A protein has these predicted regions:
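A penicillin-recognizing enzyme superfamily signal
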Residues: 216, 237-250
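Active-site helix/loop module of the DD-peptidase/beta-lactamase fold
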Residues: 63-102, 155-213, 218, 245
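Catalytic-site signature segments of enzymes, centered on catalytic residues
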Residues: 39, 107-185, 209-221
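Alpha-helical scaffold elements that line and support the substrate/ligand-binding pocket
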Residues: 26, 46-65, 97, 138-169, ...
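A short, well-structured edge-of-sheet supersecondary motif
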Residues: 7-38
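The feature captures the short pre-catalytic strand/loop hairpin that immediately precedes
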Residues: 32, 122-130, 197-207
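Substrate-binding/catalytic groove segments of enzymes
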Residues: 107-108, 233-239
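Active-site-proximal loop and beta-strand segments within enzyme catalytic domains
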Residues: 4-13, 38-49, 55-140
């Protein structure tokens, strides 16, 4: 497929594509943009944010901020007041959150209740657990795993975006990101569905903790750099940024 054929295909079949970055042998060999995007522009990568957070958890493990993915979630929130009669949340681990096997006390994600709260981590904890116990059943969650970024922030003493900048983004050449907090529910909704070019931002809750299930804005070249890091088993320019064991595990 030549460039003209690619452009014709995207125009006819994939009009939502805004950027492409192709790597070969560790170097970018082709890039292109559509829909008024520039190469440096970012877009909301939505649930791909979850994969970036998984890498950050691995880095937190490497640096000793987290001891093990088998650690109970409540180890990190000893001040959390467990609801009366709740017997499941005490057993939920980081691994349950990462593998989407954590149990939640809802059928449909409580966007309004969590996103209107002052502390999304605590609000997410309020919905963790339940009467059914640990079933091992897969339950996809976008809001519940906000607990993961809460753990990273609490153990490292850094805002998640600063943790990511220091230990992942800047080392591989991704531009420094900053937090973005929506002031209204309407602004929040607009951000989640907006297809216009964005800046280097990570959506956050009122506490400044980056959302774990969505909210990160990356360019295609940023995504390619993450992909290359994973292909290279966590090594960039001879430096191990995240353990190869973790790359294999995730």
């Amino acid at each position: 497929m030549n460039k003209k054929e690619l452009h014709d295909f995207i125009k006819e079949k994939q009009p939502n594509i805004c950027q492409i970055s192709c790597y070969k042998d560790g170097k970018e060999v082709y890039s292109d943009e559509w829909n008024n995007y520039k190469k440096i522009d970012t877009c909301h990568v939505m649930s791909a944010t979850k994969s970036i957070v998984a890498l950050l958890v691995g880095i937190a493990l490497d640096k000793g901020f987290i001891k093990s993915t088998d650690q109970p979630v409540l180890d990190f929130f000893p001040e959390y007041k467990i609801k009366r009669g709740e017997k499941t949340i005490q057993k939920v681990t980081i691994k349950h959150l990462l593998t989407m096997t954590a149990p939640y006390k809802y059928k449909y994600e409580p966007w309004t209740k969590i996103c209107s709260s002052d502390d999304w981590t605590v609000s997410a904890l309020d919905f963790l657990g339940g009467r059914k116990g640990l079933t091992g059943q897969f339950k996809y969650s976008t809001l519940g795993i906000h607990i993961l970024t809460g753990i990273i922030s609490k153990t490292s003493g850094l805002k998640v975006v600063d943790f990511a900048n220091k230990f992942l983004f800047e080392p591989i050449g991704v531009e420094k990101h900053i937090n973005y907090l929506a002031e209204t529910a309407e602004e929040h909704k607009h951000f989640t569905i907006c297809k216009e070019p964005q800046k280097n931002i990570w959506f956050c809750d009122p506490k400044g903790i980056g959302t774990a299930g969505y909210g990160l804005c990356f360019s295609a070249i940023d995504m390619a750099k993450i992909g290359q890091l994973c292909l290279d088993k966590g090594v960039h320019n001879g430096k191990q940024l995240v353990s190869s064991k973790w790359i294999e595990e995730i």
